[in-house]
């Protein structure tokens, strides 16, 4: 889990757009966040396995 202070800090409007970065909306993790879903890889995997993300299914080939 991310520090609450860092989550609040990243949610504020930055003076320069370069300083903005994505965070997982579920846990607040700053790295490995999928922009389309706004989730980190760990939360994405959990929700995908549960079937809570529409249109996402496990790949098999």
From Swiss-Prot:
Its cofactor is Zn(2+). GO terms for molecular function: rRNA binding; structural constituent of ribosome; zinc ion binding. GO terms for biological process: translation. Pfam families: Ribosomal_S14. Zn(2+) binds at residues 24, 27, 40, 43. Keywords: Metal-binding, Ribonucleoprotein, Ribosomal protein, RNA-binding, rRNA-binding, Zinc. Binds 1 zinc ion per subunit. Transmembrane segments: none annotated. InterPro entries: Ribosomal_uS14, Ribosomal_uS14_bact, Ribosomal_uS14_CS, Ribosomal_uS14_sf. One of its GO terms (cellular component) is small ribosomal subunit. Part of the 30S ribosomal subunit. Contacts proteins S3 and S10. Binds 16S rRNA, required for the assembly of 30S particles and may also be responsible for determining the conformation of the 16S rRNA at the A site. Belongs to the universal ribosomal protein uS14 family. Zinc-binding uS14 subfamily. PANTHER family: 30S RIBOSOMAL PROTEIN S14, SMALL RIBOSOMAL SUBUNIT PROTEIN US14B. This is Small ribosomal subunit protein uS14. It comes from Staphylococcus carnosus (strain TM300). The lineage of its organism: Bacteria, Bacillati, Bacillota, Bacilli, Bacillales.
């Amino acid at each position: 889990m991310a520090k609450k202070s860092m989550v609040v800090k990243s949610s504020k409007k930055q003076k320069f757009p370069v300083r903005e970065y994505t965070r997982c909306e579920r846990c607040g993790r700053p790295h490995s966040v999928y922009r389309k879903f706004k989730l980190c890889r760990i939360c994405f995997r959990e929700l995908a396995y549960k079937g809570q993300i529409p249109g996402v299914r496990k790949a098999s080939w």
